[in-house]
Amino acid sequence: MKRICSIYKSPRKNEMYLYVLKAEGLERVPEALLPFFGTPVHAFDLVLSPERKLAREDIVKVLDNLENQGYHLQMPPAEDEYIEHLPEELLRRNDPV
C-alpha cells in the first residue's frame, strides 16, 4: 500500500518531525500535541510504501500510525546518538598550565 505523506518539522525541537497523510493534512493531529510541537512547518512530501527505507524510523510503524491515528511523530535522536564525546586529553589541550 502506497501513501502520500506530508512531513512537517517542529520549530521548537530540532529533528522532530510530524508525518501526516497529505490528503488529510493536520486534521487528525491532536490539539494537545501542537503546543509541544509548535506550529508545523512543511518540510516536504514523500510517497511511503512498505518497501521504502527511512533513515531513523520503522516504515511499517509509520504506515500503521498513519492509518490508525492519522499521524506519526518522529522524536529527535537521543543525545548520545548525535554528540561526539571527545577524549579527555583533547578537552584539556588548551587549558593554561
Curated annotation (Swiss-Prot):
HAMAP family: UPF0745. Residues 3-87 form the YcgL domain. This is YcgL domain-containing protein PputW619_3899. It comes from Pseudomonas putida (strain W619). It holds the Pfam family YcgL.
